[in-house]
């Protein structure tokens, strides 16, 4: 099997993956700020790094996968105040909702899922170290800031220079900062802050800035220097750039070897966002589409490419997934282990080892499905099912998927008992030699999105199309 190569944002190139410790991978991914339901952009991040950790385990690595939860933040505080509830009540509710969405999408839970509020002492310890090392200062407004000019490698991840940032970026003026680009490590508490929004420290009551949260949790749980750090493309700057400055300023060590960033979700070639009104939650999508269809829609696009969201693309994903399940129908896949020497498995592995190239891996699944359709071979069916399983797909019985209704069908289509009743009426018509009526019922069902397949022995099976 070829070596795994990962596109490293830091190097701006694909690199052969070499873990710091042989056979072990330590990976940190920036998770979700929990003040609302997860949206399609969150779904992409969740699925992408679920695929990454699944593949790392599949090729024999022992993985420690950490994905954090940001449970203290300006948006969280504002939403809790608006709702008239405590911060903990709000965040607990949306953490629960996030876990429900994850389960629906077939996301395997990370090994460790730290909440920011569980690591306040570690954050304060890192801030104090940065102050001792000359990277941090307490400003006149009580905030503790990071002095970006003190970190000579600032911009190495994003390729942005401080001079270019000062000249071209709009930076909010703040007279208390030594430099407009300095960012906050510790926010001084405000009189109007609700209960649960601040902690005691040598700098006074306050709370951590967003960037220090991930630095402290990553270093505390995985060590000062670990293998992979991931997140959405929008986090590359300033969040991940600031994480590097904080972590390396505090420890004097390289923070992370490989930086991975998944691409944006777009609607009509514009980034999905609330401000543009083209924003969809996972739950809204799952009202109309099966969760595995949504997962397949995400999986079949390379993780670094833009993902264009539309009903047309989801409908196509549903039709494509239906083709894969149809190939497995009526074939009893054997239960032997996956054969990595089989040609399709080799092509699949080569694709996944080429920076997790899921479009090519999925194309290999369709090649294999074609072979299964042609030969009805149990060993090939097993290969198809097991390779797809590495992507979190084809885990159900084919008939269960083919007969399940999408949200839209559940809302306006025929229920299973209605379909069975019409099939029984068609059988009765055929027995009475009323073939015109039997054909009419078949056509009526097809118009309703139900395809019939008459089997030897007189039985009839159905699936949604």
Swiss-Prot record:
Binding site for Zn(2+): 30, 214, 239, 243
GO cellular component: cytosol
Binding site for ATP: 274
A Pfam family it matches: DALR_2
Listed EC numbers: 6.1.1.16
Motif ('KMSKS' region): 271-275
Gene3D superfamilies according to UniProt: Cysteine-tRNA ligase, C-terminal anti-codon recognition domain, HUPs
Keyword RNA-binding: no
Reaction(s) catalysed (UniProt annotation): tRNA(Cys) + L-cysteine + ATP = L-cysteinyl-tRNA(Cys) + AMP + diphosphate
UniProt keywords, alphabetically: Aminoacyl-tRNA synthetase, ATP-binding, Cytoplasm, Ligase, Metal-binding, Nucleotide-binding, Protein biosynthesis, Zinc
GO BP term, example: cysteinyl-tRNA aminoacylation
Listed InterPro entries: Cys-tRNA-ligase, Cys-tRNA-synt_Ia_DALR, Cys-tRNA/MSH_ligase, CysS_C, Rossmann-like_a/b/a_fold, tRNA-synt_1_cat_dom, tRNAsynth_Ia_anticodon-bd
Places the protein is found: Cytoplasm
Motif ('HIGH' region): 32-42
Cofactor annotation remark: Binds 1 zinc ion per subunit.
HAMAP family: Cys_tRNA_synth
Family membership: Belongs to the class-I aminoacyl-tRNA synthetase family.
Protein name: Cysteine--tRNA ligase
Protein source organism: Burkholderia cenocepacia (strain ATCC BAA-245 / DSM 16553 / LMG 16656 / NCTC 13227 / J2315 / CF5610) (Burkholderia cepacia (strain J2315))
Gene of this entry: cysS
